[in-house]
Amino acid sequence: FAPVSEYEAAFAMGVNVTVANVELLRQWPAIFRGRTVWLRIDLGHGDGHHAKVNTGGKEAKFGLSAQRVEEFMDAARDLGMRITGLHAHLGSGIETTAHWKLVVDELAGFARRIGTVEVLDIGGGLPIAYSADDEPFDLDAWAEGLAQIKAVHPAFRLAIEPGRFLVAESGVLLARATQVVEKDGVHRVGLDAGMNALIRPALYDAWHDIVNLARLDHDFDTDFDVVGPICESSDIFGNRVKLPADTAPGDAMVIADAGAYGFSMANTYNLRALPAEDLLDEGVSE
């Protein structure tokens, strides 16, 4: 659903372009005539840690329906196009290692029908353990499954998009406690950062561990709702977070695993400033 001008710009820069519907070809044939592209297919199912990150199936806006692949092939053939890659990303935070093996198998079937496909891009979605209750992703089992299915379909190279898995645990959000308040039995600690700095909890009900750095030697035995200063009921970083009972204004707080979909989704809503970004290289801030 990008503006067609962005497709033109991408082709001009030699960028690998992935197309996800046949309407593009019919409405702007001059832009796509003779082009080499990849095709994103909706395999009819999706997965993920939240409904808002499930990117497959009828309710998702992504990808060409598998029922229309032949239609796309006909339109591409009429324009002298070449399809060299197939893509399917069906969600984020998928815990079943066999998921990607299934995607390879399904895409390979379409690739053989098309006849010119060289690469199968099986998307990303590899999860991390955001809390102690989460099982670590079995990367060895994931790799073994891909090796097995690659042996079944040796004609195709595989592409993977492991962004979150690589960077989520590499970043944190640092903030200070501003107020500590009790209301009707609920204890809340406010921070000088809000959902504008890390929107995942508000948007996806996502859990991020939160630690009071100022009182690491104290017992983390009291439930607090950790909130921000923004005028939204969803401006909450976590409910019933275990923190020291004597948590106080001025305490330094860290919200873990903010390296993915953190600053990249930050904004200035409610006139709140963007957080500063510091890069630590061997312990030195840059």
Q: What is the predicted function of each stretch?
A:
Residues 46-47, 118-134, 159-171, 197-199:
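Flexible glycine/acidic-rich beta-alpha junction loops that bind and position SAM and/or redox cofactors
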Residues 1-119, 128, 134, 145:
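Active-site-proximal beta-alpha core segment in soluble small-molecule metabolic enzymes
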Residues 96-103, 130-142, 168-179, 240-243:
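Short glycine/threonine-rich loop-to-helix capping motif typified by GTGT followed
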Residues 116, 133-149, 153-162, 172, ...:
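Contiguous, function-dense segments enriched for cysteine-driven chemistry
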Residues 156-286:
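Charged (often Lys/Glu-rich) extended helix/loop segments that serve as interaction or gating elements
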Residues 31, 109-119, 137-144, 148-153, ...:
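Acidic/histidine-enriched ion/cofactor-binding microenvironments in catalytic or ligand-binding pockets
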Residues 19, 88, 122-124, 160-162, ...:
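Conserved beta-strand positions
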